[in-house]
Structure formats: structure tokens, C-alpha cells
């Protein structure tokens, strides 16, 4: 094999198997990527520990939910919440525990993608594929900024691709079990992981070279392990359908559930096209720039001996068809949801389990990009993007107000918790109608022991759904900009509740934020012992943000 061909081949191989899969040599260079990922994670942790102020919605939700272990928590699967609970048990409900779980999940994304790509495109290509994930805005930026469940889902999606490649190389029982384990954990991380899983299973059946290797009796091992992992949560879902799917369906319909069918389909189709364009724009531009130096080779294979060329075509042909079918099947599932009128729009983040592997697929389809020069160029572009997004993470707090942007760190949740503790020392419960407010009040109390009170903090929806008994003084707190009128819903569920007062608390935004933020506090009194609430339809809180 010529040196030129080696540059375009998947990297360090001893041989190719009968199905075109490369047999890799052991390399001692893996610590390099590992050290880079560790540096990225450590930098993220340091920056997060330097932050102050309110938490974004998803992390506030973790503070609220991860106080105990349950088989299910609501509209999102429980795996991330379980991991957050473990971190809280080890380190306490603080910013470090929040950042640690996300930081490790972020690191797992890039390390798993590197290992997944290695047998497909070699070391240079694998480094480029992993670094190129930083060019996907939903992974490189939004995952840093606000997401939780989606970050873990992406790590497991990369892990599933890694497990799939390992199965192709050696389809033994242990690797089928590993594939099933990752599949089950992925479903416990985010429900839309099922789109990727369905697409991967379908693609493996449609590519002959993969089907003959993977589909035999051992495949039941993977299915069985996945079912065992997911079964406890599935049982919870069957008993709590409204809690598991009500909020998700409302979010998918984007407020258009009463719109005519054709309008829903049109909006969904336009949303899908818009999300696709936004998702691929940045990596497409980066790959076009990297490919410019090898543009003459993109239309044809590098000249090699005939036998080597046949092996390369067999290998790359099967891999290329696998990724092509993967995207066709995943997008077909989203298209079906659009045609059924289930979705009012398609959010860009919903495409994460569908298109996360696009950089790797481009490297498979365009072998010339695996060379040292274009691969190194992609690696440098990804590194610059990673450093830039890390720098923007704290900078957005101070630069945001200059362009009229307010972030969660500006919100005065800690001063609000202090004001409530001082003004209402006898309150037994604080009821909020939004998880961002509830979680941040809990977090403010955890960070400041002087604010510890006997008052429990609870979401109104949970209060109504679980029929919790209450007694004594209860505060209904609503943040400006969110649905108001908790009092009517609360009194419908607790007829014995007696209104005492209604007050406004205006607090200045913090850390450079401009303006004031208002909160409404309704004070209620319930006789002791508190009556069990009557059944009431839970109030519809604002749909949860990205996770």
C-alpha cells in the first residue's frame, strides 16, 4: 500500500476483514485525545465554579427533582436526574455538583466520538470527527450553556455508535450486551434517543455487509439487556402517562394543537427544513474550508494498487451506505411525525440524535478529508470553536446587558429567598408555578445556610397531582412573565384556604443586569391539620426549555 493511500485510509490497520472492516493495531497515542478532553472538562468546571447568580432552567429543575430517587420524574427520563442525585449526595446541592455531572457528560461525548470514529476513519479522521462536534451549535454551545438531559443523551449516542463499530469488528455476546446496555441507558436519558436507535437498527438491516455480521441469534442479547434496563421506567410511564407525555406533547405541538391539520403539517415541514439548515450550516462551512486543499481528490479515489482500491471501496461503500440509510430512516421518522400533525414545529435540538454523526459521515463519504492536512485543519477549527465557546460562557453574563440580553445569572433569586425568609418567617410552604423559580429558591437556600427555613418549596402542578396535605401559612409566588393567578387554582384544590394578603416584591437584576424583576406573593392560611386537596386539573405551567 502506498504512503499516499495510507494517508487516506482509516489509519493504523493490520488487515481488513472479509466485510471490509479494518482490524486496528493497538496504539499508545490515545492519551493525547484523553488529555485534551480532560483539559476541556477542567476548564468548564473552573468557569462554572466562578459563576454566581441564578441557574438556567434545566439545572434549576435538577435542584428541584434530584432530592430523591424515583423511577420517573415527569416529561424527561430519569437517568440524568439519578446521576445528579448521586452527585448531590457526594458533594451537596451546590454548583460544583451540577457542573461535575454535566462536565463529565460533555467529556464523554468527545471521547466516545473519537473511539467510535477510530475504526471507520483512522486516528486523524477520528480526531477531526470529535473536534468537529464543537462546530455543531447545539453541542458546542447550547450543551455548555443550558442543556442537561440532551448532553447525557449525546454521550450515549456516541457510545452507541462506538458499540456498533465494536460489534462489527467482533460480534461476541459481551459486545451485544454492551450495545443493549448503551441502548437502554440512552432511552433513560432522552426519549428521542429512540429515533437514533430505530435508524441504526434499520440501517444495519439494509446494509448487506453489516446484516450478515450482526443479525443472528446473539442479537437477542442486546434486545434483552436493553429491555431489562428500561423496564422499570417503562412500568412507571404506564402508570403516569399524563406526567410522562403531557408536557412533551404540548411542547411538540407548540401551541398549535387546535390549528387545522394542513397548517400543522405545513408549519412542521417548514420547521424541519429550517432546523436542518441551521444544524448543518456551520459544520458544512468548516468542512468546505478544510476540503479546499484536497478538492481535486474529492471526486475520485487516490491511486492505489487494484487490490487495495477494491478493499477501500468495499469498506467505505458499506460504511457510507450505513450512514446514508441511518439519516434517511431517522429523518423519515421525523417526517412521519410532521405528516401525522403531531408536531407544530421542529426544534433544532431535536435533530441532535439524528445528525450528531454528520462530521464522521462526511469523513467516511469523502476519504480525502482523512489526510493529515485537511484533518488537522478541522481539528484546529474545532479547537478554536471550543476555546471561543468556553470564553463566551462567563462573558455572556457581563456582555449580555450591553446588547439587551438577560440570562438566568442576572435574576435575583437569592435576594428573593432572603426577602421571603425575612418577611414571612412563619411560612410552612412556598408554592411556585415554574420549575426555574422553585429550583432557584431551593438552590439559594442551599448556598446560604442563614436562609434555611421550615418552608418546603413545591411546584403547583406537583401539589395538585400528588394531593399533598398542607397546613399553616402558605406562600404562592409567581415571577413576572409567567402565568399568573395561582390563587384560584390553589383555592380550587384547597377549599379551606383563606387569603391573608397579596404583595409585590421588586428586586434589581444582578451582575450587570439592567432593570428590575417583580414577583407576586399571595399569602394563604390553611387550618391544621390540612385537608387533602380535592382533585383538580393541574395548571399548565410554561413548557420546559431545552434539556
PLM regions and their residue ranges:
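Membrane-interface alpha helices of multi-pass inner-membrane proteins
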Residues: 68, 129, 175-191, 202, ...
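Transmembrane-helix motifs of polytopic, lipid-linked glycan transferases
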Residues: 100-120, 159-160
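Short helix- or helix-capping micro-motifs
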Residues: 37-40, 129-138, 183, 187
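Transmembrane-lumen/periplasm boundary regions of multi-pass, lipid-linked membrane glycan transferases
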Residues: 197-320, 330
Amino acid at each position: 500500500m502506498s504512503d499516499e493511500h495510507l494517508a487516506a485510509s482509516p489509519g493504523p490497520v493490520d488487515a481488513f476483514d472479509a466485510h471490509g472492516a479494518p482490524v486496528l493495531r493497538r496504539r499508545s497515542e490515545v492519551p493525547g485525545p484523553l488529555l485534551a478532553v480532560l483539559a476541556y472538562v477542567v476548564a468548564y468546571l473552573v468557569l462554572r465554579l466562578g459563576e454566581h447568580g441564578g441557574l438556567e432552567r434545566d439545572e434549576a429543575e435538577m435542584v428541584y427533582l434530584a432530592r430523591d430517587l424515583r423511577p420517573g420524574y415527569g416529561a424527561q427520563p430519569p437517568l440524568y436526574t439519578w446521576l445528579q442525585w448521586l452527585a448531590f449526595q457526594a458533594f451537596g446541592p451546590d454548583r460544583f455538583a451540577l457542573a461535575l455531572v454535566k462536565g463529565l457528560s460533555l467529556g464523554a461525548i468527545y471521547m466516545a466520538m473519537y473511539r467510535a470514529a477510530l475504526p471507520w476513519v483512522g486516528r486523524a479522521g477520528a480526531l477531526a470527527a470529535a473536534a468537529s462536534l464543537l462546530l455543531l451549535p447545539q453541542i458546542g454551545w447550547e450543551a455548555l450553556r443550558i442543556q442537561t438531559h440532551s448532553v447525557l443523551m449525546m454521550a450515549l449516542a456516541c457510545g452507541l455508535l462506538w458499540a456498533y463499530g465494536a460489534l462489527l469488528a467482533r460480534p461476541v455476546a459481551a459486545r451485544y450486551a454492551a450495545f443493549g446496555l448503551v441502548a437502554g441507558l440512552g432511552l433513560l436519558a432522552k426519549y428521542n434517543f429512540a429515533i437514533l436507535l430505530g435508524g441504526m437498527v434499520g440501517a444495519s438491516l439494509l446494509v448487506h455487509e453489516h446484516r450478515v455480521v450482526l443479525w443472528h441469534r446473539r442479537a437477542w442479547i442486546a434486545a434483552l439487556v436493553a429491555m431489562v434496563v428500561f423496564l422499570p421506567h417503562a412500568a412507571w410511564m404506564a402508570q403516569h402517562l399524563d406526567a410522562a407525555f403531557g408536557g412533551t406533547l404540548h411542547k411538540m405541538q407548540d401551541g398549535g394543537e387546535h390549528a387545522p391539520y394542513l397548517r400543522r403539517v405545513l408549519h412542521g415541514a417548514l420547521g424541519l427544513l429550517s432546523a436542518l439548515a441551521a444544524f448543518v450550516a456551520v459544520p458544512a462551512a468548516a468542512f468546505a474550508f478544510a476540503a479546499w486543499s484536497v478538492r481535486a481528490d474529492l471526486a475520485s479515489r487516490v491511486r492505489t494498487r487494484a487490490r487495495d482500491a477494491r478493499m477501500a471501496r468495499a469498506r467505505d461503500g458499506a460504511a457510507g451506505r450505513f450512514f446514508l440509510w441511518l439519516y434517511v430512516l431517522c429523518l423519515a421518522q421525523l417526517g412521519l411525525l410532521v405528516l401525522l400533525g403531531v408536531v407544530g414545529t421542529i426544534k433544532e435540538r431535536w435533530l441532535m440524535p439524528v445528525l450528531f454523526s454528520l462530521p464522521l459521515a462526511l469523513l467516511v463519504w469523502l476519504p480525502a478529508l482523512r489526510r493529515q492536512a485537511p484533518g488537522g485543519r478541522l481539528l484546529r477549527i474545532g479547537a478554536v470553536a471550543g476555546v471561543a465557546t468556553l470564553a463566551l460562557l462567563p462573558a455572556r453574563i457581563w456582555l449580555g446587558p450591553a446588547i439587551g440580553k438577560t440570562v438566568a445569572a442576572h435574576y435575583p433569586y437569592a435576594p428573593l429567598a432572603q426577602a421571603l425568609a425575612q418577611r414571612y418567617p412563619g411560612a410552612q410552604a412556598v408554592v411556585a408555578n415554574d420549575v426555574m423559580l422553585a429550583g432557584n429558591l431551593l438552590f439559594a437556600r442551599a448556598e446560604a445556610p442563614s436562609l434555611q427555613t421550615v418552608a418546603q418549596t413545591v411546584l403547583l402542578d406537583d401539589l395538585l397531582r400528588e394531593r399533598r396535605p398542607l397546613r399553616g401559612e402558605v406562600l404562592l409566588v409567581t415571577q413576572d412573565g409567567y402565568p399568573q393567578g395561582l390563587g384560584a387554582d390553589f383555592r380550587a384544590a384547597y377549599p379551606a384556604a383563606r387569603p391573608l394578603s397579596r404583595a409585590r416584591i421588586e428586586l434589581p437584576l444582578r451582575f450587570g443586569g439592567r432593570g428590575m424583576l417583580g414577583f407576586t406573593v399571595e399569602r394563604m392560611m390553611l387550618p391544621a391539620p390540612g385537608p387533602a386537596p380535592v382533585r383538580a386539573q393541574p395548571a399548565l405551567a410554561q413548557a420546559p426549555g431545552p434539556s
